[in-house]
């Protein structure tokens, strides 16, 4: 006879991220019952627990996970949802370490580009890399995130800018699921930069995206969303809208890099198209925030890029709070402006640099990060959700944000399986 539950986790403190009036959505003493990869019950009384213990294949007793002396009271670990990094560019060729040295020696962006650096240097190296090379390096990068309890990662293309390489990047991203205990959400970011072959004709490149690249990628099912870098050094509002309109024709939700370097009104346009998220948003003005409320768009903060580029304009966190706009936090892991392979460090940065609270930061890597990807089945410990869970040897969830590179989970469950 089959067991009622596949796994039961008990003797843990649970930061559920539910909105129950408790910090971090802490639950009273509760056991989590898992069946077929999902949370199917939250058991809060001894009678329920005793019954469940007799009907479960695998039992995890949290009080046995943290070593203690014989006469000491066992320390109960904290259980949180698996983390979600909702904005990365971790599939690419080469690196930009040499460019980093040049920057520190005073070289300008133009000088670096003239020497073959910058985003076009990464495009060249990515185009030259075969699929296996891209996969091998992407596995190493994604593994760093997974080691911190990340169980879902968004991965963008955008370093190919031609059809073949963009397809190769997205295929590599999807295949990470075969090698690591992680869910991958892919985003087509063809409108990331203007490739050399279009000779400064951005409109012609947008024609190419809408006529050739996006239809092929959509037909192959390689993209879960479409993104655009809408900025003075990226693409205009009109060009961005053309890509958004095309994405909608293929049933793909949109996201946007906006207001990183200027107030381009990209956030308002993204909201018009019901964007899942607007990312960066350092130059977002207060008067544009109501449009995000109306479209239920998530504001994604990327403190790694802010730090790495020595930016000074901070995102309008107070105004976002005042309007109850959900705030997510991500690494923006990329070779040029945020080579950051640590979501926990990004959470610390979001507090130190942008003044989020630790709870806001942790919700930004769980509940709100899930919303930024259009996923309503994770990011919160609740019945019906995917059993992506992490266990930590900490006294309070705030420790995960407060301590830089100080914690790794003592256990991770992906789709209910202990990995």
Swiss-Prot record:
What's the domain of life for this entry?
Answer: Bacteria
Provide the cofactor note recorded for this chain's UniProt entry.
Binds 1 zinc or iron ion per subunit.
Q: Give the InterPro entries listed for this entry.
A: Amidohydro-rel, HutI, Metal-dep_hydrolase_composite, Metal_Hydrolase
Keyword Heme in record: no
First-listed, main subcellular location of the protein, grouped into a coarse class? cytoplasm
Record-listed N-formimidoyl-L-glutamate binding positions: 159, 334, 336
**Leader peptide range in chain numbering:** none
Q: Which pathway does the record list?
A: Amino-acid degradation; L-histidine degradation into L-glutamate; N-formimidoyl-L-glutamate from L-histidine: step 3/3
Spell out the molecular function terms from Gene Ontology.
imidazolonepropionase activity; iron ion binding; zinc ion binding
Q: What class of enzyme is it?
A: hydrolase
Compartments where found: Cytoplasm
Q: Quote a single Gene Ontology cellular component term.
A: cytoplasm
Q: What is this protein called?
A: Imidazolonepropionase
* Biological source species: Alteromonas mediterranea (strain DSM 17117 / CIP 110805 / LMG 28347 / Deep ecotype)
By which gene is this protein encoded? Answer: hutI
